[in-house]
């Protein structure tokens, strides 16, 4: 099944010119390496939305570890295995299963809306939604 994945950074640095191309390259490099189909993505200043499908949970897990780890290391200059004083990512990766049909189409629209808002082509629109259980804990 397809999944909606959100990676949220502690810092608003993901859309900086030098980081945009790096993240796009890592996204598609990881997708190819771990056989993950990326249906849609939105790179925002402090978070990334992905609509993806993987052949197995292991592939998706490995892809997300690769992507999150490489982005954090490349942007902060952190070295793997060396303790850092801070975490680049604000929260753990958020995921939910996306059902085919209306759910899939609505998520495509939502990610597209994020892309347009990020580019400044449309005004930011407040989301009227209930917080997820994950968000209530913080």
Residue ranges with predicted function:
Residues 1-138:
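Short catalytic/metal-binding and nucleic-acid-binding patches
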